[in-house]
Amino acid sequence: MSDICWICNDVCDERNNFCGCNEEYKVVHIKCMQLWINYSKKKECNLCKTKYNIKKTYVSFKKWNWCFNDKKTTLFKIFFILFALVFIFLTITLSNDMANLVTGINDLICSIIFLIVYTVVMLTSICFSVFVVAIVVDFLLEAKEKNSFLTIREIV
């Protein structure tokens, strides 16, 4: 009688040593185990709790798949980045004019008000810059994770 792969329930003549289990749990196709590991993202056997010998491999950046499941979040991030970049550009463009305006005013109260407004605009621009960097880094880390796969090897 032939052995049966515990993942696909097909006939299997392979006996692989991916964990500490014995007998029927060693009967598994290598391709089935690869698919199961990449799907489940489990790092250890559910039964014997032995850690799998797994290597994470990343796809080359040029070959990344940029399709994301959560399109609303991705769209929100893109629109936020565009809005922030436009705001930052306008702040930089207008900052020189605002500085000249503040220094040209003789009234102390108006000068202080303009200085406060100018400072708030600049701080907002800096905050937007930090948020843009954080969102881009998060976006790239998520893409990197989605463009990776796990390779399992037998335990020696």
Curated annotation (Swiss-Prot):
Cross-referenced InterPro entries: Znf_RING-CH, Znf_RING/FYVE/PHD
Signal peptide positions on this chain: none
Task performed by this protein: E3 ubiquitin-protein ligase which promotes ubiquitination and subsequent degradation of host MHC-I and CD4 molecules, presumably to prevent lysis of infected cells by cytotoxic T-lymphocytes and NK cell. Binds target molecules through transmembrane interaction. The result of this ubiquitination is the enhancement of the endocytosis of the target chain and the delivery to the lysosome, where it is proteolytically destroyed.
Keywords on record: Host endosome, Host Golgi apparatus, Host membrane, Host-virus interaction, Inhibition of host adaptive immune response by virus, Inhibition of host MHC class I molecule presentation by virus, Membrane, Metal-binding, Modulation of host ubiquitin pathway by viral E3 ligase, Modulation of host ubiquitin pathway by virus, Transferase, Transmembrane, Transmembrane helix, Ubl conjugation pathway, Viral immunoevasion, Zinc, Zinc-finger
Residues involved in Zn(2+) 2 binding: 19, 21, 45, 48
Enzyme class at the top of the EC tree: transferase
GO molecular function: transferase activity; zinc ion binding
Domain of life of the native organism: Viruses
Enzyme Commission number: 2.3.2.27
Compartments, record wording: Host membrane; Host Golgi apparatus, Host trans-Golgi network membrane; Host early endosome membrane
The keyword Transferase is annotated on this UniProt entry: yes
Annotated positions binding Zn(2+) 1: 5, 8, 29, 32
Protein's GO biological process: symbiont-mediated perturbation of host ubiquitin-like protein modification; symbiont-mediated suppression of host antigen processing and presentation of peptide antigen via MHC class I
Lumenal compartment segments: 95-111
Catalytic reaction annotation: S-ubiquitinyl-[E2 ubiquitin-conjugating enzyme]-L-cysteine + [acceptor protein]-L-lysine = [E2 ubiquitin-conjugating enzyme]-L-cysteine + N(6)-ubiquitinyl-[acceptor protein]-L-lysine
Organism field: Yaba-like disease virus
Residue intervals annotated with topology Cytoplasmic: 1-73, 133-156
Domain notes for this protein: The RING-CH-type zinc finger domain is required for E3 ligase activity.
Family membership noted in the UniProt record: Belongs to the poxviridae LAP protein family.
Protein name: E3 ubiquitin-protein ligase LAP
Zn finger limits (RING-CH-type): 1-55
Transmembrane segments: 74-94, 112-132
Membrane topology: Multi-pass membrane protein
Keyword Transmembrane helix: yes
GO cellular component, one term: membrane
